[in-house]
C-alpha cells in the first residue's frame, strides 16, 4: 500500500483489538486505505515522515482520520495527541481516541488536548462493529475537514 494514500491511520498495540477494528471497517468497505502501526512512536514517525518513513511519505499527505489507542508501549496515545496538536502542520488532523479506558482523567486530558472524539470500545463484537461503522461513516463520508 502506498503510504501517501492513507484514509485511516490505526494506532493500536493490541493485535486482537487492531484486527477487530480492521474487520469492522472491512465489513462496511471502509478499510481499503487503512494503515496500522503498533505503537505511539511509530505513529509519530508515520505522521511526520521520520524514522523508517523518511523519504517514503510526504508529510503533506495526511490521513483523513487517526484512530488512536491510549495505553501503548513506547509512547502513550496522550503523548501522540500532544505532538499532533502541537505542530502547525498536523494540528487540525481528525483524531479519535478508540480505547478501553473509561477513566475520567484520560477523557478530560484528551479533550483538553483537542481530541475530536473519545470512544470506549464496546466489549461485544457486534456492538464494536456497529460503533466502527458509525465512526467510519461519519469521519470518512459526512465530515468536512478543514484541510
Roles of regions detected by a PLM:
Residues 57-61, 85-92, 113:
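Conserved phosphotransfer cores of two-component systems
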Residues 121:
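A Lys-centered signature of the CheY-like receiver
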Amino acid at each position: 500500500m502506498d503510504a501517501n494514500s492513507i484514509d485511516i491511520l490505526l494506532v493500536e498495540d493490541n493485535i486482537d483489538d487492531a484486527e477487530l477494528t480492521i474487520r469492522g471497517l472491512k465489513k462496511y468497505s471502509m478499510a481499503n486505505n487503512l494503515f496500522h502501526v503498533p505503537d505511539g512512536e511509530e505513529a509519530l514517525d508515520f505522521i511526520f515522515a521520520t524514522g523508517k518513513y523518511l523519504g517514503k511519505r510526504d508529510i503533506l499527505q495526511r490521513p483523513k482520520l487517526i484512530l488512536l489507542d491510549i495505553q501503548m508501549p513506547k509512547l502513550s496515545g496522550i503523548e501522540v495527541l500532544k505532538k499532533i496538536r502541537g505542530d502547525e502542520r498536523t494540528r487540525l488532523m481528525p483524531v479519535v481516541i478508540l480505547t478501553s479506558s473509561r477513566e475520567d482523567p484520560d477523557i478530560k486530558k484528551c479533550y483538553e488536548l483537542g481530541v475530536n472524539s473519545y470512544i470506549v470500545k464496546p466489549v461485544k463484537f457486534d456492538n464494536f462493529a456497529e460503533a466502527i461503522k458509525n465512526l467510519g461513516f461519519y469521519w470518512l463520508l459526512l465530515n468536512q475537514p478543514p484541510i
